[in-house]
C-alpha cells in the first residue's frame, strides 16, 4: 500500500495573483491536508472518509480522485485496478487549496504505486489540468507548492512550471478558516475584466519587490510589500469580518494579513510566537462563524507532498 499526504497551501500569498503559492503545515504537528492511499485490487474502487467527507460529490465519477485515477491511467496507457481511499481532512471552498490537496495526493499516490512512470514535471502538468477541472481554469499556484513544498513562483516558460522562492524561518502563518464556503468560480467572477494602468504598475512593483526581498532575506520589506491590488479589494465583500480581522492584525502586531486563495480563509504573518498566539486567539473568538471553522499557527511546509506509508 502507498499512502500520500498533501499539505494545505495559500494561493496568491496576497501579492502574486495566480502566480505565487505557499505550502503550510501547523507547528503542533497536526496534518492540515488530504491523504490518499492506494492498494492492489481486482477492480477499481474509491472509498471516502475524513472530517469533510459529507461535502464530497454523491456520484463517485464526479470525485476529483476518481478523475485523477482515470487521467493517470490514460497518461500511462494502462488501466490499473486499485482500491483508493481519500481521507478528506480539508474543507471544500476554503481557500486552503482543498482540491489541490486531493489532486496532488491522488496523482502522486498512483505514480508511487506504479513505480514512478511519470517524472515530477509530467505529474505537475497533470495536477494543473485536474485542478483546472475544479476551479474552471488551469493554474498551478496551489498544486505546485502542495506537491513541491515551500513557496513557489509560477513561470510556465522553457518547460519550467515553477521555481522555489526562499521564505523566512521566523515567520509564523496564522491560518483562520471561518467555516463558510466561498466558490473559487464565484470569487473569480467578481473580479473586473480590466484594470487601470496605475494598478498594474503597483502590482508589478509589489510582486517584483517581494520576490527580491525574499531572495535577499529582508523580511520586513517582504511583509510590507505583501499587498493585493488585484483581488482583495473586490473579494472582501464575500468575506464577513475580514476588514475587522485585518485591522486587528495591525493592532496586534502582525507583519501582514491577507486572503488565502479566493477565501474565506485568511492568513496573518507574525514573527513572534506571542504575537501569533494573540492573533490566533482573536481570530478564534471573532472570525470563526461556526464549529467547522478552525485556526492553526503554521510554518511553511518545505517538504510538500510525501509518503506516510
Curated annotation (Swiss-Prot):
PROSITE patterns cross-referenced by the UniProt entry? GHMP_KINASES_ATP
Q: Name one GO molecular function term.
A: homoserine kinase activity
Query: Which residues take part in binding ATP?
Result: 91-101
Q: Which reaction does it catalyse?
A: L-homoserine + ATP = O-phospho-L-homoserine + ADP + H(+)
* Keyword Nucleotide-binding in record: yes
InterPro entries associated with the record: GHMP_kinase_C_dom, GHMP_kinase_C_sf, GHMP_kinase_N_dom, GHMP_knse_ATP-bd_CS, Homoserine_kinase, Ribosomal_Su5_D2-typ_SF, Ribsml_uS5_D2-typ_fold_subgr
User: What's a GO cellular component annotated to this UniProt protein?
Assistant: cytoplasm
In terms of Gene3D superfamilies, this protein maps to: 3.30.230.10, GHMP kinase, C-terminal domain
This entry's Enzyme Commission designation comes to 2.7.1.39
Q: In which pathway does it act?
A: Amino-acid biosynthesis; L-threonine biosynthesis; L-threonine from L-aspartate: step 4/5
UniProt subcellular location: Cytoplasm
Pfam families annotated for this entry? GHMP_kinases_C, GHMP_kinases_N
Identify the enzyme class: transferase
Give GO terms for biological process.
Answer: threonine biosynthetic process
Per UniProt, which keywords does this protein have? Amino-acid biosynthesis, ATP-binding, Cytoplasm, Kinase, Nucleotide-binding, Threonine biosynthesis, Transferase
Spell out the family assignment given in the record's similarity comment: Belongs to the GHMP kinase family. Homoserine kinase subfamily.
Q: What is the documented function of this protein?
A: Catalyzes the ATP-dependent phosphorylation of L-homoserine to L-homoserine phosphate.
- Its name, as the record gives it, is Homoserine kinase
Originating gene: thrB
